[in-house]
């Protein structure tokens, strides 16, 4: 999915806009590095906890999951707030400064991807990986359609929207499937 937006931009909008978009995209990808590190620590922790599961450990997993999810949102917010400084000091070409407008949406997209990876852990643990394949195929098709229609209507910004919407869809569908294969007290957690 990461490359489809660039292919559509190059063909539908032009190489110059692709260059500007790519700069903003790369800055937004800082969240990808953070969430990849978090998920690398998360999955072994999750699998260990799930092997010794009790109702209390389920609550602990849910609580920690929400904290990590919030942490990713906060990190994306901080990146968004400091991105003007990053652009000022590291993106020296004036023609690329407008790439700043893509950073927040791309950072948010990678937050959603991190959330997806967290919930995918439950599916992997239950050895239901086929569902992840189905979800991925659906999302690739969904992303291609979104890129076409959103870029056609909103230009390069449509590509950023398509990425965020696709990763959010990835997360939501995976969360629903995850809950079916390994029920957790995600909603009831708030009632207690």
Where are the regions that the model predicts?
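Membrane-interface junctions at transmembrane-helix termini in multi-pass inner-membrane proteins
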Residues: 104-135
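Helix-loop junctions and terminal segments of transmembrane helices
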Residues: 32-53, 120-125
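Residue-level recognition of pore/gate-forming positions within transmembrane alpha-helices
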Residues: 26-29, 72, 76, 110, ...
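Interfacial/gating helices of multi-pass transporter permease domains
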Residues: 9-29, 97-100, 156-161
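Membrane-interface helix-loop junctions in multi-pass transport and translocation proteins
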Residues: 16, 83, 130, 137-172, ...
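Interfacial segments at transmembrane-helix termini and the short loops linking adjacent helices
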Residues: 15, 81-111, 157
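Interfacial transmembrane-helix starts/ends
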Residues: 54-70, 74-82, 100-103
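Alpha-helical transmembrane segments of polytopic membrane transporters and translocases
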Residues: 5-7, 19-35, 66-67, 167
């Amino acid at each position: 999915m990461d490359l489809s937006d660039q292919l559509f931009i190059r063909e539908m909008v032009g190489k110059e806009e692709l260059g500007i978009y790519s700069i903003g995209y790369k800055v937004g990808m800082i969240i990808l590095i953070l969430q990849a590190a978090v998920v690398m620590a998360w999955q072994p922790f999750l699998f260990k906890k799930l092997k010794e599961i009790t109702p209390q450990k389920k609550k602990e997993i849910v609580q920690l999951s929400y904290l990590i999810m919030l942490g990713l949102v906060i990190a994306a917010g901080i990146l968004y707030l400091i991105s003007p400084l990053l652009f000022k000091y590291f993106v020296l070409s004036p023609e690329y400064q407008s790439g700043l407008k893509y950073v927040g949406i791309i950072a948010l997209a990678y937050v959603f991807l991190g959330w997806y990876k967290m919930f995918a852990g439950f599916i992997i643990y239950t050895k239901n990986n086929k569902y992840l394949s189905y979800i991925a195929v659906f999302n690739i098709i969904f992303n291609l359609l979104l890129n076409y229609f959103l870029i056609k209507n909103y230009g390069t910004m449509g590509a950023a929207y398509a990425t965020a919407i696709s990763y959010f869809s990835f997360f939501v569908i995976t969360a629903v499937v995850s809950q079916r294969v390994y029920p957790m007290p995600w909603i009831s957690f708030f009632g207690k």
